Amino acid sequence: MTPDELNIILPTLPEKPGCYQYFDEDGKVIYVGKAKNLRRRVSSYFYKEHADRKTRILVRQIRSIKYIVVDSEGDALLLENSLIKEYQPRYNVLLKDGKTYPSIVIKREPFPRIFATRDIKKDGSEYFGPYPGALIAKGMLRLVKEIYPIRTCKLDLREEKIRQGRYRVCLQYHIKKCKGPCIGNQTSNEYESNVSEIRDLLRGNLHRLVRMYRDRMQVYSEGLRFEEAQICKERIELLERYEAKHTVVPRNIDNVDVFSYDEDEHTAYINYMHIEHGGINRVYTLEYRKQIEESKEELLAAAITELRQRFESNAHEIVLPFDTGWQTGESITTTIPRRGDKRKLLELSEKNVAQYKLDKLKRAEKLNPEQRALHIVHGIQKDLHLDRPPKHIECFDNSNIQGTSPVAACVVFKMGKPSKKDYRKFHVKTVEGPNDFASMREIISRHYTRLTEENLPLPDLIVVDGGKGQLSAAYETLDKLGLIGKIPIIGLAERLEEIFFPKDPVPLILDKKSETLKVIQHLRDEAHRFGIGFHRDVRSKKQIQSELDNIKGIGKKTKEDLLRHFKSVKRIRSAEEEELSALIGRNKAKLLYEGLRKK
């Protein structure tokens, strides 16, 4: 829109609550929004600098504006939800259903069937749920079928067809799981009475059913109808056993909606739980694909409206993790609990939404391993407060025994995994005796001097195996090379798995299950393994050299032949003189045999 057009339109917008619609040059709705004050909200799009690229693109595409005034912000929220569903604007959040949770349906038909389904149809049938998983839905159905004999067939049980005698009973009738309404053995009223009780059960109202069966059992017992009293007793036991296993909500919390929120860079996740009759009888997760500068408060408020409408919730209270400003004209209490039973319910919802987000990430990572690697390095960046993701990490470890044969190792991880072709071994050349700090200075200096001189890529992070002393030695060396600020460096102290930063006496302690800590531990362990293996090889080689070199008459070629054949000095020493003679000749064999026996 041109500045002249804006100067005409914006001042005329009302300072009232309502919804606004942005149209592109084709007259298509590209964005719908709600506002407490229409003029202020719409003006902010044109008179404010936007950091978000999508917002800038949206503003450039706006060619006309329409608005609808309503009585309250709550009405604006409801209207916005309807308009987004109607027009599906390109720049609004994209609503995606969470995984399709199962519900239990009571079909609208004569002698209604009751079964689990993921397909909700608007055919007048009643739906209960959705349940958090198929096992829970099946468990509830199993309870229903243990208590009530309901039909499972798909027969058309209209009265005239039953009268015509078209049907025969099935196995369910013979095993007493169905009373045979198909042949007229059960009246519609009797069947509907059972269905009415099943509705109570599916709504979670177990206590009312238990009281009802206790009263019936008393009446049957007094009337000496012991068989019927026994059936009531068995049903009470089934209900109480189910309740003991599944009730996780205090009985004083009834008809309450609980919402929790989580998000990543591109998506918001909202979990919804409905609490009724002391039980959780509905759990659902929505995904909102973020499109344009929505706050978490706006996204959660939109989800509350959407979910309450979808499931026709009349809950008198909603429990939230933070204030959203959500309101309607209804008298609904909003609670943000800090402790107590409602806080526990909110934490349960938060666990569900976090698990949903994690499951989605795991599924995506299975399909795309590179995404998992990227997720890990971004996690390391976040946990260690780095300026860039550490896609290339180098870790150093020294190895010696009382200062003898000092060596060092450098292992390299790329995208969170070992890159063995880039591993490096070092002989420590300038250090006498056991001095790990001096050894670290030498190795860091040699390695990074070579990288800078040869213009090779530097790592995104250096990890030093050791505490503050080793870290300080490496940091001082990097400072002399002018690399401070170019390469971040940390030290890992083994005893408590503390992570130290240069010139900071307070270590960082990560969660033991943290991916970042696991990668750093893997780096440290790999450097340790590689360094010890190299040190063992060096010691072994020196030992071989010292034992065979000191025997006169045994030259380099002879040593090579012996080691190739016997593999070790120990086996050479245990060999008989005749065996040695066959390989290197009688004279050399005698010199070698006697020389090794003297040692």
Curated annotation (Swiss-Prot):
One of its GO terms (molecular function) is DNA binding. SUPFAM superfamilies: C-terminal UvrC-binding domain of UvrB, GIY-YIG endonuclease, RuvA domain 2-like. One of its GO terms (cellular component) is cytoplasm. One of its GO terms (biological process) is SOS response. The keyword DNA repair applies. Gene3D superfamilies: 5' to 3' exonuclease, C-terminal subdomain (1.10.150.20), GIY-YIG endonuclease (3.40.1440.10), UvrC, RNAse H endonuclease domain (3.30.420.340). Residues 207-242 form the UVR domain. The keyword Cytoplasm applies. It comes from the Bacteria. Keywords: Cytoplasm, DNA damage, DNA excision, DNA repair, Excision nuclease, SOS response. SMART domains: GIYc. PROSITE patterns: GIY_YIG, UVRC. Belongs to the UvrC family. Interacts with UvrB in an incision complex. It holds the Pfam family HHH_5. InterPro entries: GIY-YIG_endonuc (IPR000305), GIY-YIG_endonuc_sf (IPR035901), GIY-YIG_UvrC_Cho (IPR047296), RuvA_2-like (IPR010994), UVR_dom_sf (IPR036876), UvrABC_protein_C (IPR050066), UvrC (IPR004791), UvrC_RNase_H_dom (IPR001162). Its main location: cytoplasm. The UvrABC repair system catalyzes the recognition and processing of DNA lesions. UvrC both incises the 5' and 3' sides of the lesion. The N-terminal half is responsible for the 3' incision and the C-terminal half is responsible for the 5' incision. This is UvrABC system protein C. It is found in: Cytoplasm. Residues 15-93 form the GIY-YIG domain.
